[in-house]
Amino acid sequence: LYKADPFAFSAEYRPGTASVTADISGFSWNDSDWISKRSQADMTKQPISIYEVHLGSWKKKDREEKDGYYTYVEAAHELAAYVKEMGYTHVELMGIAEHPYDGSWGYQVTGYFAPTSRYGSPKDFMYFVNYLHKNGIGVILDWVPAHFPKDAHGLADFDGHPLFEYEDPRKGEHPDWGTKVFDYGKNEVKDFLISNALYWVEEYHVDGLRVDAVASMLYLDYGREPGQWVPNKNGGNQNLEAIEFFKHLNTVVQGRNHGVAMIAEESTAWPKVTDHPENDGLGFTFKWNMGWMHDFLEYMKLDPYFRKYNHNRMTFSLTYFTSENYILVLSHDEVVHLKCSMINKMPGLGEDKFSNLKAGYTFMLGHPGKKLLFMGQDFGQWHEWDEKVSLDWYLAEEESHKKLQEYVRDLLHIYKKYPCLYQLDNDWNGFQWINANDGDRSIFSFIRKDETGKKNLLFVVNFTPVDRPDYRVGVPKRCKLSLLLDNVHGAYKPSQCPTYTSVKSECDGQPYSISYPLGGYGTAIFRF
């Protein structure tokens, strides 16, 4: 039996399984300005809009060809141009560490230190990161310390016995996924994983790691029936060793690399995920807001008539948004396994679907928290994501899809331009409801504020097809409001923004108000 080198820098192109000797020294990096700026910034107060990408299916040289992959070098140029035009600040890459099975999407890793050879060499991947940095785009990697596959050449039973994994199968095997679980109580295993995290950050200059399946690491009974798991020394279901691992991991990575984001995909209500370890937190920079995602999608899928009975699905997340540093995510997991693409989740036919999605994305942009959108969902990909084929890029040339794409682009550029949309994401001072209770008409209005409290944006979003030609919305002071964007025109040119002046007329508990013609599925963002 031949095993791959756990520390190999490169691997054979699948289905080959051998490790490949690779020299990763000597690459000519020229992203020092980017790294310096990153190290001085507080990421929680920066605009972060993430484009989640699976390189193997983002674009292909032949859409239907099994491989037909762009190389890291080719993808760097294509992807940077697209991301820059759209206004995303970061890309998050799935499946970069070497993995044998395409259908795992890169979440069953056999080569933790090897960029997958599907797209080129280690230095090709360095080129990718360097090129994106030169274009002002950050790079985040999916990282999988939760489990590893049982492939014979991988880490499982590495010396003929459990070595990297827990020996007791009640802790060392994940029944749902058929994979092995790392033994977080072994110093050697913890060092292996932490050195791997540092390797990607320090050797490849990546700007963050999105840690996959955190909940499966935190709970000993995750995915297990009674009798299939072992309680901790206190009789509880918390994996105390994994908790200490996270605290140590985040302290080391962020202590050595200020400005690098550690992001938790944590699907439960585990407390203090993004708090400091000295406060008994796990020490992550951000946490995916899975609760918001679930409530948002359940609401958006409803026929507009029934939305008034589910109004709280859109307001509930605004009761806890300060509890963590959140990222609002519409990820790959939501557009696979018969869940439908984002556009096909929307009710109605034809243009109604596009109008619904524009309204949903506008609400998402205004909601506190950083943003993540999976590839294809910004232009309305009809099909669910399939890792075997390219996105349907021809759709972006069709009018409805192109208008949706341009609308998302306008939203993202507004997001980067106005600090009120990102400076106070987990601070009550950064958000103010104007009307959270207009459930009968399914209209939401709220204000986002910057640190000065003087440069604000007012959002109004209508989630029904009913026109409101004289919709009155409260405003806290006498002022002029400039309409930056609506669902009909997209973003207005600065010199062409329609203006409205608030009048002394109480509305929504505010002393002033404006009247605005709010169309069906209408959206409006005002600056004041």
Q: What do the PLM-derived regions correspond to, one by one?
A:
Residues 5, 37-45, 54-238, 510:
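Substrate-binding/active-site clefts of carbohydrate-active enzymes
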Residues 341-361:
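Aromatic-anchored helix/helix-loop segment that forms the rim or "lid"
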Residues 131-135, 158, 162-167, 173, ...:
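Active-site-proximal helices and loops of the catalytic beta/alpha 8
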